[in-house]
């Protein structure tokens, strides 16, 4: 219902129904972006069926982000929506929503499913909230700090100003950004070193 309401802004108004069957071997509620994939597929179908709007990867990403994060209030960022909409491997500059696509051959990945229920949304909300709180506190104390500029990092000094419970979240935010920059550097090379990428993925996880 939310998707249909949002799509009215794009002059997409369904006037008849369809019987749709969706099947997949991707486990749900496992942090594999299955909800984003479904929303993007749904938006793509509706736009192509009930509107004359030109459908692009950028448009699908923007609308799905609006639905999932702004309208529904989920705590994720933009990476799921943009990666699924564009396909393959991308680097997303979240400040400008600029996408850099890559066409490297990646190795196969093995996904282990524990079948244990988990609160993915609750976990994301906790991580995001505490990371933003810690970053904001450091910025207030050290105005020159810029998380997008590693040269401004004085980690030990920053950590000393935070409560112990917030330190892991700030350390993770800093560490994850460095990992992202290192991964971008590797993907910008003509030859992709799978071992280095695998190591960075493990560090990030």
Where are these regions (language model features)?
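Gly/Ser-rich oxyanion-binding loop with an adjacent helix/lid
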Residues: 1-104
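C-terminal nucleotide
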Residues: 83, 88-205
């Amino acid at each position: 219902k939310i998707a249909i309401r949002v799509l009215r802004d794009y002059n997409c108004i369904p006037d008849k129904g369809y019987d749709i069957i969706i099947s997949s071997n991707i486990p749900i509620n496992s942090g594999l972006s299955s909800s984003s994939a479904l929303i993007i597929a749904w938006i793509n179908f509706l736009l192509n069926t009930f509107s004359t709007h030109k459908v692009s990867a950028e448009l699908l990403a923007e609308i799905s982000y609006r639905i999932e994060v702004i309208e529904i209030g989920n705590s994720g960022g933009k990476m799921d929506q943009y990666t699924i909409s564009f396909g393959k491997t991308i680097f997303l500059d979240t400040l400008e929503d600029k996408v850099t696509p890559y066409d490297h051959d990646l190795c196969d990945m093995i996904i282990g499913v524990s079948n244990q229920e988990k609160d993915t949304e609750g976990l994301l909300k906790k991580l995001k909230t505490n990371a933003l709180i810690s970053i904001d506190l450091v910025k207030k104390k050290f105005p020159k700090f810029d998380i997008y500029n590693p040269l401004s990092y004085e980690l030990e000094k920053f950590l000393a100003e935070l409560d112990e419970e917030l330190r892991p979240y700030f350390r993770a935010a800093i560490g994850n950004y460095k990992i992202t920059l290192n991964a971008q550097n590797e993907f910008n090379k003509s030859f992709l070193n799978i071992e280095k990428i695998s190591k960075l993925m493990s560090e990030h996880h």
